[in-house]
């Protein structure tokens, strides 16, 4: 499993997100 803090963060690309979160299609990290 990826390490991804459960924090709602808007993003445009994966590098906008914390830890191993990825930028999902709805525009938020997950």
UniProtKB/Swiss-Prot annotation:
It is found in: Secreted. The keyword Secreted applies. GO terms for cellular component: extracellular region. The record marks 6-7 as: Reactive bond. It holds the Pfam family Squash. One of its GO terms (molecular function) is serine-type endopeptidase inhibitor activity. SMART domains: PTI. Disulfide bonds join 4-21, 11-23, 17-29. Its main location: secreted. It comes from the Eukaryota. Keywords: Disulfide bond, Knottin, Protease inhibitor, Secreted, Serine protease inhibitor. Belongs to the protease inhibitor I7 (squash-type serine protease inhibitor) family. Strongly inhibits trypsin, weakly inhibits chymotrypsin. The presence of a 'disulfide through disulfide knot' structurally defines this protein as a knottin. This is Trypsin inhibitor 6. It comes from Cyclanthera pedata.
């Amino acid at each position: 499993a990826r390490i991804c803090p459960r924090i709602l963060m808007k993003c445009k690309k994966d590098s906008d997100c914390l830890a191993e979160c990825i930028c999902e299609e709805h525009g938020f990290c997950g």
